[in-house]
Amino acid sequence: MAVLAKFISKNHPSVPIIIISNAPESAAASVAAIPSISYHRLPLPEIPPDMTTDRVELFFELPRLSNPNLLTALQQISQKTRIRAVILDFFCNAAFEVPTSLNIPTYYYFSAGTPTAILTLYFETIDETIPVDLQDLNDYVDIPGLPPIHCLDIPVALSPRKSLVYKSSVDISKNLRRSAGILVNGFDALEFRAIGSHSQRPMHFKGPTPPVYFIGPLVGDVDTKAGSEEHECLRWLDTQPSKSVVFLCFGRRGVFSAKQLKETAAALENSGHRFLWSVRNPPELKKATGSDEPDLDELLPEGFLERTKDRGFVIKSWAPQKEVLAHDSVGGFVTHCGRSSVSEGVWFGVPMIGWPVDAELRLNRAVMVDDLQVALPLEEEAGGFVTAAELEKRVRELMETKAGKAVRQRVTELKLSARAAVAENGSSLNDLKKFLHATRD
């Protein structure tokens, strides 16, 4: 939400924004210096002893526990100023009834982008037309605004019809149609299929839907400061030829087994290409050692670091992703397909290889490969394992072949479209103006 708040403030600095959250105030440090943005911290709710421990279910349930505190906060703020709109992250659907009970126009924001927004909007129809668990269907689902999506590419958490996440998703789908509008981290050229579907039959699926505003891509600022350990890789990139380095980075959730790390190392060595690789400690070793920092000599094949030292750089854990993608030496990006990573890859014009690791990421890959054509797919074995031969093949394909050149050309075109969307009179800034105008009515 902080990135969205900064985007609104940058383009409309006179609009006052209050971020309401129960996260520590340190989480709002990035907006502390912006006069139009303030932070209201909610008290942490009391957690019932029988609360679910499932990570995904917690995303949906924790906001419900904060509803009494949210109601109090909105009432207090309303005594000082008129609240023209509330924007909810879609994970905070449980809070929808709080602002609407106060007659405050309530919008949903999808930072995860259009594929997730469309799937969520369509989910009530899926619930009514597909009577079995999605993972058992073994077929494609036709969703207006998306390419044909195989059921195995729909987040696995949505499969058990009796699960809390499934029921919450149906509830969100219904509330989306009751909301004042939907804000999506995307832009016209990136969402051409969704926009075409919406214009032809206004995404009505189960009835009329509210306006959809594409206001992206929301890409944070690039920090090119040198000298700190985490930016050492940027100095290494300075010594590499233009568009020669393959960057591998997999987000917060991209943690691989020791076996997969060895397989990845073999692929990179055999490919012969330059690489920058962000490695995190495997779950089994992190649990045993209590450390996030991997022991590269122990994890990677014997002699790998020495043999590849002239063309490879391995980062322990965190990598400055935006800064790396912005560097001229980077010519390819192996990504977990998270929306932020996809947006950054497009923004900086870096062709991608899609390696989804969780949740909505398979859905994102399907769109990246089939619709946008900005990525090559990786074929996975059972359990999501990727062989060295498969990864080597895709790296070579991206960096050496006509297919890779076509992906590079397409992502370069979208890079220009992305920057045009957030320039003066661009499509995303125009949608932002429409949204703000709607809140003044």
From Swiss-Prot:
It comes from the Eukaryota. It catalyses: baicalein + UDP-alpha-D-glucuronate = baicalin + UDP. PANTHER family: GLYCOSYLTRANSFERASE. It holds the Pfam family UDPGT. Optimum pH is 7.5. Homodimer. GO terms for molecular function: baicalein 7-O-glucuronosyltransferase activity; UDP-glucosyltransferase activity. Belongs to the UDP-glycosyltransferase family. Its EC number is 2.4.1.253. Involved in the production of glucuronosylated baicalein, a flavonoid that shows antiallergic, anti-HIV and antitumor activities. Can use baicalein, scutellarein and wogonin as substrates, but not chrysin, apigenin, luteolin, quercetin, formononetin and daidzein. Highly specific for UDP-glucuronate (UDP-GlcUA) and no activity with UDP-glucose or UDP-galacturonic acid. SUPFAM superfamilies: UDP-Glycosyltransferase/glycogen phosphorylase (SSF53756). It is an enzyme of class 2 (transferase). Optimum temperature is 30-40 degrees Celsius. This is Baicalein 7-O-glucuronosyltransferase. Keywords: Glycosyltransferase, Transferase. Inhibited by copper, zinc and iron, p-Chloromercuri-benzoic acid (PCMBA) and 4,4'-diisothiocyanostilbene-2,2'-disulfonic acid (DIDS), but not by N-ethylmaleimide (NEM), dithioerythritol (DTE), calcium or magnesium.
